Amino acid sequence: EEIAQFMRDMDTSGRGEPGIFNRRAANLNKPERRAFAQFGSNPCGEISLRPMQFCNLSIAVARADDTLESLMEKVEVATIIGTIQATATYFPGLRPEWKKNCEEERLLGVDLTGQLDSRVAQDPFSMMKLREHAVEVNKRYAELLGINQAAAVTTVKPGGNSSVLLN
């Protein structure tokens, strides 16, 4: 009964899955592309989505033997996949705002999981280079596909066991 009540409460709240969320800290760290009144959170709080929006998550797996070059190749593939995913904006059954928001920002969520296994992925300079590469790859492929460049490209998602499963 307790679990059933928990699920009902989650459903009727309209907020999605529960969690601990510090709104003050989130507002201090919100991206510039978000107006104060628009910013809130959702189950993907680290992406800073608009209401009625989602991103195109893709993951590159960092391994102990990766070099900056091998991680750049992995991030490039993940970015291309995310950019292609961003072309899919036909959402029957959802309000038109979903399509509008997703087409305007074409958000990607290129994630690098397995960071603790890789010295390169722990290096701030390498991470900056990987982010810059992802942004450039998205820009190039968005132009080829005739869509907007993503307003945001990279993220760090809590990946759980995906780094083990995606070996």
Name these PLM-found stretches:
Residues 2-6, 56, 70-73, 126-129, ...:
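Exposed alpha-helical structural elements
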Residues 7, 33-35, 133-135, 166:
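Short glycine-cluster motifs
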Residues 1, 89-99, 107, 112-158:
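Internal maturation/activation junctions in enzymes
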Residues 2-5, 36-45, 136, 145-147:
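Short amphipathic alpha-helical surface micro-motifs
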Residues 11-119:
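Function-dense linear segments that define catalytic or interfacial modules
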